[in-house]
Amino acid sequence: LTPPKLGPIEIRVTTIRTGKSVTFLQFEMTQNSEVVLVATGSWASINEGIESPQIMIPEVPGPEDCPVPTRITDSPTRLHEKWEIRSVNQALSASFENNNSRMQWWIRPKETTPMSSSLIVAAADALPPPIFFQSDKIKMAPTIDLTIHVRVDIDSVQWNGASWLLAEFVTNHASGGFIEEDGLIWDDAEELKQLAALSHPKP
């Protein structure tokens, strides 16, 4: 709803409904008595059932073979200072910026951070929309809506300080001053972690 500032926050969690296998929660973050974020979440237990094929991780150079991106945003941001980021597209082509609506990145926190659903959500929202690299007109695109589907049992993930996540995002649609972006994230053990759909306003 509005960007929070550095400082104390309060988070209120409300259980909307609890069923046999799914629990629905609502989160409200406030700062200085102002609501800055509202989120809803659905937590489901893992059950036996139909298993369709996984979306396979793309064959791309490893993070050690990918450079630090030459441009994330026009100016450094506090958000990007928290992450190590490597550009797969730059490793594959020096001219990707002008003609690619699909971007691939290796990303991990600079500080050792335990694997969690919160980490996956943060990684999904840490990278700029691919359309940034197609147009110089877009300088900022704050997220107004973010949907994440976590596709793995977090407790089963092998994760340490040297681990990376591979993120792939594509700008599928832009109109009326808004950008729609879809993404996938895998860990470096090649397991799909999340599907993301983001909406950004275009200044």
Located regions from the model:
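Terminal targeting signals and extreme-terminal segments of soluble enzymes
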Residues: 1-203
